[in-house]
Each structure stands twice: as structure tokens, then as C-alpha cells.
Regions:
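Hydrophobic pocket-lining residues within nucleotide cofactor-binding pockets
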Residues: 15, 105, 158, 205-208
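Short hydrophobic "helix-edge" motifs at membrane interfaces and signal-peptide entry regions
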Residues: 3-5, 47-48, 126, 149-151, ...
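Juxtacatalytic C-terminal regulatory tail of Ser/Thr protein kinases
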Residues: 170-191
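Acidic, proline/glycine-rich low-complexity intrinsically disordered segments
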Residues: 187-210
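Catalytic beta-strand-to-alpha-helix segment of the class III nucleotidyl cyclase homology domain
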Residues: 61-171
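Catalytic NTP-binding/metal-coordinating core of nucleotidyl cyclase/transferase enzymes
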Residues: 1-75, 79-80, 209-210
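Short glycine/proline-enriched loop/turn "hinge" motifs that connect secondary-structure elements
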Residues: 1-4, 90, 191-196
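Residue-level signature of catalytic and energy-coupling elements of molecular machines
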Residues: 14, 41, 57, 100, ...
């Protein structure tokens, strides 16, 4: 089958601290990951019309025709994961990091390639455990369609991407955590006025609206 190009929303996800979790309890971690996929992530992807492109030991790469569907899916999975982890000790929690990008991709068979995919993977690496980072184009596409707030993390220079990426963090209702730079370090806080401008205030979306 010949490769084809198309525009798609790409969601990349992985498990924060996967090696540590596996080292502490390999069988228990694998069993919980299998349960999370069967009970939560895979059904949510199907509900929002996504296609799981590939899985790794600790990661997922998912393609959506709609960026709105991609963001809704990510937010619903992360909120459900937070509920699932509520009574789990901190050192045993399985927490996901997610990145979403909208871009031109190449589909070859069932796999996908291209800069649009690579950017999603780099956004994922910038996300905090339990968090979601998106590119500016994703924020611009969904900000007037969904009621989520976004926190501007500024331009980030990331590995193997020649241009800086403007990164936004979806605010899931928790107190704002320190911003991270491309290496995962806490970034300097912006001035108060800049911080106010950086956050797009929206009322949270209800379950029925989603």
C-alpha cells in the first residue's frame, strides 16, 4: 500500500516513572496497565473515534481525525486516572503524561510518521505526570469549542525539532504546578501581569456538554 499524507490530530502518551514502577513491582505494574487499557483508555479512544496506531511497554500513539475529539479523550482519561489514583499511595500511582499536536502526517500501512508525530512526542515529554501539553495550533482550534483553560508555557526548544514550539498546558482543575522547560526542570515564573495574560479563562465543560 502506498503511503499517503493527511492532516491529523496526534496524541502521544506514556507512563511517568515507568522504570521505577517496574523495578518496584513488575507483575503488579503490568497487571494494572492492562486493566487501565481495557477499562479506561481503549474504550475512551473508541468513544472519541480515535485509532491506536501503536503501543509500547509504557506508551501509546493515537490518531484522531478531529482535534476536538483528541483533546476531549485526553482530558477524560486524565480525569478518570486522577479518580482511580485517589486512594493509591503516591509511590505506586500510575500517572500518564500526554502531548497533542495537529499536523501533516504520512500514513504507511497502519503506522504514521512525520514532523506532526514527532512534535506530539516532544509535547508529551514536557507534560507533568497526570498532565496534558498541546501545541499552539491545538489550543487555537479548541479554545472556542471546549471550555478548558490553558496555561501558556512559552516557546520551548525540544530535541530533533529545528524550530521552537509554543506549548500550552491544559488546566485540569488542580492548583497550578510549576512550569517545566524542555528538560523537565521547573521554569522561572512569569511576572504577575504576564501570568494573567498567559491563562485563557474558560468555565469547565460539563460531562453533558462533552
Amino acid at each position: 500500500m502506498a503511503s499517503t499524507r493527511r492532516l491529523a490530530a496526534i496524541l502521544a502518551a506514556d507512563v511517568a516513572g515507568y522504570s521505577r514502577l517496574m523495578g518496584a513491582d513488575e507483575e503488579g505494574t503490568l497487571a494494572e496497565l492492562k486493566a487501565i487499557r481495557g477499562e479506561l483508555s481503549d474504550p475512551k479512544v473508541k468513544e472519541h473515534r480515535g485509532r491506536i496506531v501503536k503501543t509500547t511497554g509504557d506508551g501509546l500513539l493515537i490518531e484522531f481525525a478531529s482535534v476536538v475529539d483528541a483533546v476531549r479523550c485526553a482530558v477524560e482519561v486524565q480525569r478518570a486516572m486522577a479518580e482511580r489514583n485517589a486512594d493509591v499511595p503516591l509511590d505506586r500511582r500510575i500517572e500518564l503524561r500526554m502531548g497533542i499536536n495537529l499536523g501533516d502526517i504520512i500514513r504507511d500501512g497502519r503506522d504514521i510518521y512525520g514532523d506532526g508525530v514527532n512534535v506530539a512526542a516532544r509535547l508529551k515529554a514536557l507534560a507533568e505526570p497526570g498532565g496534558i501539553c498541546v501545541s499552539r495550533v491545538v489550543r487555537d482550534q479548541v479554545r472556542d469549542k471546549l471550555g478548558f483553560s490553558f496555561e501558556d508555557m512559552g516557546e520551548q526548544q525540544v530535541k530533533n525539532i529545528t524550530r521552537p514550539i509554543r506549548v500550552h498546558r491544559i488546566v485540569l482543575g488542580e492548583k497550578s504546578n510549576p512550569l517545566r522547560d524542555a528538560n523537565g526542570r521547573a521554569a522561572a515564573k512569569p511576572a504577575a501581569g504576564a501570568a494573567r495574560q498567559a491563562v485563557d479563562r474558560r468555565a469547565p465543560v460539563s460531562e453533558h456538554e462533552r
